[in-house]
Structures are given as C-alpha cells and as structure tokens.
A protein has these predicted regions:
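A short, Lys/Arg-rich alpha-helix, primarily the initiator
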Residues: 1-27
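DNA-binding alpha-helical recognition surfaces that contact promoter or target DNA
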Residues: 19, 23, 36, 47, ...
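Helix-turn-helix/winged-helix DNA-binding modules
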Residues: 26, 52-55, 66
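Short alpha-helical DNA-recognition segment
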Residues: 27-50
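Residues in the helix-turn-helix
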Residues: 44, 54, 73
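DNA major-groove recognition helix of helix-turn-helix/homeodomain DNA-binding modules
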Residues: 58-73
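Short amphipathic recognition helices of helix-turn-helix/homeodomain-type DNA-binding modules
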Residues: 73-83
Length: 83
C-alpha cells in the first residue's frame, strides 16, 4: 500500500465503506458477477467489501454510475453538501 493509500485508509472507515459497497451489490448479484460489472475480480471485490482495501477512483466512479449514489455517500455514508 502506498503512503497516500495508507493516509486515506487511516482517515476513512474501510469496513463501513465495504458495507456500503455490499449494499450496492445487493442480494441478487454474486461477487463474481458484480466484480465483472466493475471490471475487477471476485478477490478484489471481497477485499473492498471486507474493508481490507481502498477502492480506486476508477472503481468509485463505476460504483457511483451503477448505484446512482454519490461518492461522498460511498466513502462516508453522508449525502453531499449543497454548494
């Protein structure tokens, strides 16, 4: 893990992010199928869902597109603040 990734993971609750990713996946998709949709393998998706890895910006954007949830919500569980 790079220094930047370590700093980010220290400030974010990776387990909570993982729970939100699992919520986005829902019960109708397997990790294999959802991973394919995101362009990643089942092992990497599992690491995200278990809070063992920080999702890349590319994956966050794909999750946002798929779920129509904000990246703020995916990372923090909060709605984005209005400008």
């Amino acid at each position: 893990m790079t220094t930047t990734a370590k700093n980010i993971s220290a400030r974010l609750d990776l387990k909570a992010i993982g729970r939100r990713i699992r919520e986005i996946r829902g019960f109708d998709l397997t990790q294999v199928d959802f991973g394919r949709m995101l362009g990643i393998g089942q092992t990497q998706l599992s690491k995200y869902e278990l809070g063992q890895s920080v999702p890349t910006v590319q994956i966050l954007l794909r999750l946002k597109t798929y779920s129509r949830k904000s990246i703020d919500w995916i990372l923090t569980g909060e709605k984005p603040q209005a400008d």
